[in-house]
């Protein structure tokens, strides 16, 4: 003991370890819920499960669903005990609750440490942000513009895409007619970024340095958020000071705020042309909110869109590249749509129902998140069946396992690119099976109060990118190899970020379209 007293580093280590174990013990009991446990039990066992959560998360959720699909189960994670709600009635009960009971933003905020990395998703500052309904209205405004044949929005959107595709993919559609390989994810992510910036920030999409900045920011947020979360609250501001995300966020806020000011000086009565214009006008009409509160919301929307949209785009391209039997029917549909609707119009994209089905099946077969409808109980909550959740509990629904449940999706372990097209034909309810349709059995875009409002814009981007690629090019995996395996991190499934595909320009006849 004298040695310990004379060695401050050892004393500090003992105090730190004791404090950590105490906090872990408190967290263990405070977040405990009276439902079955999947994984290791007990204080030590749950601690081991927490460490292994990074690798075992998706397997734990699958196992829990198979054993408890009519009720619920809990798993030990770095956030404490998280509860997976499998019962339909219980899911319906919590998914539409207000944020003062079950908050989706609180989960996002904690996951990405938004206070430091993503101010537009900071739960602690939610009262200062432009409200979620206003954000949803701005995205609905963009959706309505895209659907209006007399509005220049969608033709401008297509031109922005064509320019971005040429600059970023760097494979000329007019030849040479040879296979050219390149890394799929980084190239297509920049195309998605350019399209998203076009919708959110308009003319700023023409500034490559802004695309660079936004792409870099989107890459570092998950990394910095994960790193900051490793530290206790008292140390997080210090750790964040040495991370890139806060500095990049400040730079983006400055650039976009200056652009809004420039537009205001140029024309005080400017008619909104993009989401930033719309949000700036909303702030004018609703005193009490700052321009910065709108800007950080726009930036958070960009982050929310670029990763999910790029991942589904890449998954779809990898599936097409390794399933040649779908190329001709999809290509024929694209050609017919372009002829019938006069080129790359919104109506043409909407009429590509087989392509829509293929993309949705690629999403089902490669679910981004094994969980969906993630919420944090912002106060103690009790389900109608008596199950109690203490304040702070994280809950989610088993998105991944449901998508492979044979009772919901017959032959779910097999890829069927026309699955949803055939269901639409059989039931005569086409809108029930579109990519953008959310339901209690298909939670990829969420469901209920926080169904993703940006899914319509994302669907336009993905369908346009995939249709253009398939129409103008033959596609294959590099060296005509097999589909690269996905990688997982916690609940998340990613396509192989380093996977390379090959494109070869097609020799199109003049009658085939443009």
UniProtKB/Swiss-Prot annotation:
Pathway info: Secondary metabolite biosynthesis
UniProt cross-references to InterPro entries, sorted A to Z: Cyt_P450, Cyt_P450_CS, Cyt_P450_E_grp-I, Cyt_P450_sf
Predominant localisation class: membrane
GO annotation (BP), single: mycotoxin biosynthetic process
Top-level taxon of origin: Eukaryota
Carbohydrate-modified residues: 148, 486
Cofactor: heme
This protein's name: Cytochrome P450 monooxygenase ptmQ
Keyword field: Glycoprotein, Heme, Iron, Membrane, Metal-binding, Monooxygenase, Oxidoreductase, Transmembrane, Transmembrane helix
GO molecular function, one term: heme binding
Cellular component terms (Gene Ontology): membrane
Organism: Penicillium ochrochloron
Record-listed heme binding positions: 452
EC numbers for this chain: 1.-.-.-
Stated family: Belongs to the cytochrome P450 family.
Record-annotated membrane-spanning stretches: 3-23
């Amino acid at each position: 003991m004298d040695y310990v007293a004379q060695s401050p580093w050892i004393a500090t280590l003992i105090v730190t370890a004791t404090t950590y174990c105490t906090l872990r013990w408190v967290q263990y009991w405070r977040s405990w819920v009276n439902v079955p446990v999947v994984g290791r039990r007990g204080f030590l066992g749950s601690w081991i499960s927490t460490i292994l959560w990074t690798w075992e998360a998706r397997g734990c959720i699958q196992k829990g669903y198979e054993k408890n699909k009519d009720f619920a189960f809990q798993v030990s994670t770095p956030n404490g005990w998280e509860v997976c709600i499998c019962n339909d009635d219980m899911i319906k009960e919590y998914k539409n609750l207000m944020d003062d009971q079950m908050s989706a933003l609180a989960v996002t905020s904690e996951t990405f440490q938004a206070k430091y990395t993503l101010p537009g998703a900071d739960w602690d500052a939610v009262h200062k942000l432009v409200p979620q309904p206003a954000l949803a209205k701005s995205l609905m405004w963009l959706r309505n513009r895209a659907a209006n044949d007399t509005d220049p929005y969608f033709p401008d959107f297509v031109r922005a895409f064509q320019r971005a595709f040429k600059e970023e993919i760097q494979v000329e559609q007019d030849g040479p007619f040879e296979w050219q390989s390149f890394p799929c994810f980084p190239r297509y992510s920049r195309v998605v970024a350019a399209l998203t910036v076009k919708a959110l920030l308009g003319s700023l999409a023409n500034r490559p340095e802004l695309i660079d900045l936004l792409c870099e920011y989107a890459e570092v947020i998950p990394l910095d958020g994960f790193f900051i979360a490793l530290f206790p609250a008292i140390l997080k501001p210090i750790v964040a000071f040495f991370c890139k995300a806060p500095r990049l966020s400040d730079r983006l806020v400055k650039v976009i705020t200056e652009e809004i000011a420039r537009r205001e000086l140029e024309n005080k009565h400017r008619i909104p042309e993009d989401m930033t214009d719309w949000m700036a006008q909303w702030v004018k009409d609703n005193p009490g909110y700052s321009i910065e509160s709108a800007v950080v919301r726009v930036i958070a929307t960009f982050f929310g869109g670029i990763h999910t949209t790029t991942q589904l785009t890449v998954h779809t391209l990898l599936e097409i590249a390794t399933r040649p039997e779908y190329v001709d029917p999809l290509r024929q549909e694209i050609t017919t749509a372009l002829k019938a609707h006069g080129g790359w119009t919104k109506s043409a994209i909407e009429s590509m129902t087989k392509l829509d089905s293929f993309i949705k099946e690629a999403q089902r077969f490669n679910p981004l998140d094994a969980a969906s409808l993630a919420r944090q109980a912002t106060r103690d909550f009790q389900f109608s069946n008596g199950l109690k959740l203490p304040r702070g509990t994280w809950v989610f629904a088993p998105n991944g396992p449901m998508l492979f449940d044979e009772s919901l999706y017959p032959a779910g372990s097999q890829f069927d690119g026309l699955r949803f097209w055939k269901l639409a034909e059989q039931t005569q309810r086409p809108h029930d099976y579109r990519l953008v349709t959310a339901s209690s059995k298909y939670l990829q875009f969420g469901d209920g109060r926080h169904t993703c409002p940006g899914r319509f814009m994302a669907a336009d981007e993905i369908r346009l990118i995939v249709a253009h690629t398939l129409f103008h090019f033959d596609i294959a995996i590099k060296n005509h190899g097999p589909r690269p395996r996905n990688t997982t991190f916690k609940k998340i499934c990613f396509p192989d970020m380093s996977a390379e595909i090959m494109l070869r320009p097609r020799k199109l006849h003049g009658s085939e379209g443009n």
